[in-house]
Each structure stands twice: as C-alpha cells, then as structure tokens.
C-alpha cells in the first residue's frame, strides 16, 4: 500500500442497531480520510458469532449510506486488500501467530480451563489481579512437539517482555507508558483456531495499510499490547486517535443495553439524519479558529475543517435538548417542499380526512423541533375532541364564552359566502379582519374563538383562519355551528 496516503477503517461488529458512540467513530474515521484526500474502508468484524445478530450487516450498510459516510473499499464493493469481512480472512491469522512462535515471540500454551480457573481463584484469594503465570512459556521444544503431535488442545500466547515499559503516543491523550510486568501474555489464537479480537485487529490493520486508527478510549489499555505485536512483526505502528466516551450523565455511559437511543431510534422519533450527525460530531469535538462559534455544519464543511486536535479528553455528555435545538434549526432550513416531503408521513399517521397539507406544513415548519411530535398536534382534524367552553375565555384576546358566541355568529354568514375562496388563506384572513374592523373589535377577539371552535384546543398549528382554510368550508361551517350550539348550552 502507498505509505504516504491516509487510510482509515471503520470496523463494526454486526451486533444490532448503530450505537451513537459507534456512529461517532465512523464519522471521525470518515472525516479523517476525506480531509486528507485518503481512503475510508469498511471492514465487518464478525468473528464473535455468539454476538452476531441476523440482519445487522444490512443495518451497518444502510446507516452509513443514510448518513453519507460512503466507503471507498468494503465487502460489497471490494478493493485491493479484501476480503473485507473478518470471518472470510480466517486462514491467514494462524500462520502469522506461528511465525511469532518460530521467532520465539509467542508460544503454545496447553493449560486447561480447569487449571486457569484454579490459578485465578488462588490469585483472587491472595488479593492479586488475575493473570497467566507463564506455566507454558518456556516448555522444552521437544515436549511442545510431542504434545502437538498427540493432538492436545492449545492456545498461542504472545511472549510479553517481563521487564521495561511499553509506550505509545496518542493524538488526544498524549504519551502513555505501561510497565510490561503489568501485562498478561495475551492469547493470539484460541483453542478453536480462531484469532482473538486484538490479534485479528492488528494483522488486518497492517495488511490493509491502515495509517490512522480511531476508536473509543476504552481501548487505551489494550494499545500497549497492540504496539508489542506491531514491534514483534517489525510493522509500522499507525497513528492512534482515542475518543472520549459518550455519557448519559456524569456517572453513566450511554448504552443501548440500558435503553438509550441508537441512531435508528432517533430517526424513528423524527430527528433528521443530518442533524443527528451534526450533533454527534460535536460530542467530544469542537472546531477551531473562525469556526469555533459555529454549531451547524454540513458534512462537506466538516470534511473541510476537520482536525483530530479538536477532540477532547473529557467524556462527552449526550444532551437531548441540544440535539433538539440543532434538529429544529435543520428543520427551519429546509425548503417548504423538502419539509412537506419529510412531514407528510407523520401527518398521515394522524389525519385521514382531506386537508390542505401545504398550508398545514407552512404553519408547522417554524414551530416544529422533532417530526415525531407532529401527529399529537393534529388529532382534532379527524374528529372534534370534547372540550369545555371555558377554553373560550382569554384575557389577552379579551374573550369570554359569551363574546365567543357573538364572534362566531358574526363569522357564520361570512364563512358561508360561496364567493369566499377557502383555498386562499390571505383572502379569508383579510375578510375576517374587515369583519373585526366593522364590529370595532381587534382581530383576536374574532379569530381566537374560531380556532377553539375548529379544534377544541388552545394551541394549534395555525390560527383560526389557517385552520378554516386547511379544513375547507364544509367542515368549518359544521364545526362553527356545533360550537354556537355548545355555547348556547
């Protein structure tokens, strides 16, 4: 692989929906590659069959496509260093482990589960951290050959140096060193011949020419072992970028197991994909310089200004109110046509009678923060809810149930006039305004009761004339007449 070109990879496990933290890793990995005009690789790490969820690979594909994180190499489109599904690469890992054995950097371990359990129990009883005691580390070569020939089960362990320190540099956390004596002789190949996650990761990253590894800070403690593997093979160590955890609050990590929202959950609630990605990017990262005060970024803008130097060491708190605010801003920036297209599925959940959707959307868009909250605002269109006439009392509009009846009776002939065009909201509003002037009243005195009569609610997506135009003449007259009857009690 060309050594001067940035190559990054997103390597998810197909275990279900896309966690917010995973999606942030995918985004940062994508931005790192694209900012440097490099290559973004998708690799599926499916070796843990116990956690594999049917259909989860499609969730990964669909989520990345939906969010615009399109990969340059991957399982479906191929590339020069495939296959890009880890389970399809199984044959190569054992030979790399055996190479380390031949060079004296790894060894066959024949310890049984029972021995290891007894060892760890003893260590715990003595107040020690559990660790492997190196029982098979220096077995005579002849004994190893005999035990292998006899078909005795084994794992392959890496020989971690017993003395000295192993250090590494991280873009976010700086230089970190760990005493070698604190590290276990990690398993590289399990008894079933499958590689461990750490080993497969290092081998695959090297063979795929990965230059920058971006992952969660929970992997910081494993990184010295990764480095020892790179050194054992004589391979170039990639640039490490570890990201802080995404927290629900000061004490708890965001976790789908605890019912916290996945990307799919947020979209299902009516958050826009672009808004979610914008917010996720700001979870633990902030732009510098002239962009420091900016909060709304397109993916193209993020590619342009991306720098891993903006990643914080501090845990990022997932703030639902901040996400709402960003989502509301994205909704406001949509064209009326785009908003209607996105809002219609939500409108159709609640409204099954003919209405003027264009006018409804014009009223919804400035007020809407999350699309999923649209249906609950529209329940009065299909059926008039039962309401108390006390709703007609409004100090600001100087209305009472008595004045409301007077206002509705004054509006009835106007709204009944066949020449009044209900498809033109401004025409209807101006006619009502003229009627208010004729009566010597303010607009609200006349139109506030109309809104109550048509909806049975104080808060609606639009005032009285807007609701009348959305519903049309027939429904409007039926509801106004019913309201007058109710007020006559």
Residue ranges and their predicted role:
Residues 34-46, 199-212, 233-247, 460-466, ...:
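Glycine-rich phosphate/pyrophosphate-binding loops
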Residues 83-87, 110, 189-190, 208-219, ...:
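Conserved phosphate-binding loops in nucleotide/dinucleotide-binding enzymes
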Residues 102, 107-242, 248-254, 262:
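Active-site cores that bind ATP or allylic diphosphates and position pyrophosphate for catalysis
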Residues 20, 266-274, 313-319, 352-360, ...:
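Structural motif
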Residues 2-125, 222-235, 275:
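N-terminal Rossmann-like or analogous alpha/beta NTP/dinucleotide-binding catalytic cores
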Residues 29, 60, 100, 104, ...:
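Residue-level signal for inorganic ion chemistry
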Residues 426-488:
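Charged substrate- and nucleic-acid-binding regions of tRNA-handling and nucleotidyl-transfer enzymes
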Residues 336-439:
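Small-residue-rich helix-loop
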């Amino acid at each position: 692989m060309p050594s001067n070109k940035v190559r990054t990879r997103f390597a998810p496990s197909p275990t279900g929906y896309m966690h917010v933290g995973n999606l942030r890793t995918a985004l940062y990995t994508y931005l790192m590659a694209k900012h440097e005009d490099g290559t973004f690789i998708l690799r599926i790490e499916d070796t843990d069959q116990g956690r594999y969820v049917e259909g989860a690979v499609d969730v990964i594909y669909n989520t990345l496509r939906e969010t615009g994180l399109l990969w340059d190499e991957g399982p479906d489109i191929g590339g020069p260093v495939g296959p890009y599904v880890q389970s399809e690469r199984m044959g190569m890992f054992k030979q790399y482990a055996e190479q380390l054995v031949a060079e004296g950097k790894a060894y066959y371990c024949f310890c049984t589960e029972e021995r290891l359990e007894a060892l760890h129990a003893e260590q715990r009883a003595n107040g020690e951290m559990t660790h492997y005691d190196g029982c098979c580390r220096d077995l005579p070569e002849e004994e190893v050959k005999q035990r292998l020939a006899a078909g005795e089960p084994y794992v392959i362990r890496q020989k971690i140096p017993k003395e000295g320190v192993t250090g590494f540099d991280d873009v976010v956390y700086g230089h970190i060193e760990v005493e070698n004596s604190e590290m276990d002789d990690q398993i590289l190949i399990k008894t079933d011949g499958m590689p461990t996650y750490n080993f497969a990761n290092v081998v695959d990253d090297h063979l795929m020419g990965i230059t920058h590894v971006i992952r969660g800070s929970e992997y910081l403690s494993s990184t010295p072992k990764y480095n020892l593997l790179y050194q054992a093979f004589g391979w170039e160590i990639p640039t490490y970028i570890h990201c802080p955890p995404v927290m629900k609050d000061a004490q708890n990590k965001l976790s789908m197991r605890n019912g916290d929202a996945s990307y799919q959950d947020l979209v299902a609630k009516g958050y826009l994909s672009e808004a979610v990605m914008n917010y996720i990017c700001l979870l633990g990262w902030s732009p510098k310089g002239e962009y420091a005060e900016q909060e709304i970024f397109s993916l193209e803008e993020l590619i342009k200004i991306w720098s891993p130097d903006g990643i914080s060491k501090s845990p990022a708190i997932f703030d639902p109110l901040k996400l709402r605010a960003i989502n509301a801003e994205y909704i406001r920036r949509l064209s009326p046509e785009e908003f209607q297209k996105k809002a219609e599925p939500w409108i159709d959940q609640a409204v099954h009678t003919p209405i003027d959707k264009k006018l409804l959307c014009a009223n919804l868009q400035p007020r809407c923060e999350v699309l999923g909250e649209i249906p609950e605002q529209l329940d009065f269109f299909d059926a008039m809810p039962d309401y108390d006439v006390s709703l007609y009392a409004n100090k600001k509009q100087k209305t009472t149930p008595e004045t409301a009846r007077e206002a509705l009776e004054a509006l009835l002939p106007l709204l009944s006039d066949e020449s009044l065009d209900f498809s033109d909201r401004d025409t209807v509003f101006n006619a009502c305004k003229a009627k208010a002037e004729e009566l010597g009243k303010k607009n609200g005195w006349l139109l506030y009761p109309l809104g109550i009569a048509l909806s049975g609610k104080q808060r609606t997506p639009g005032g009285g004339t807007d609701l009348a135009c959305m519903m049309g003449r027939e429904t409007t007259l039926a509801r106004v007449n019913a309201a007058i009857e109710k007020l006559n009690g």
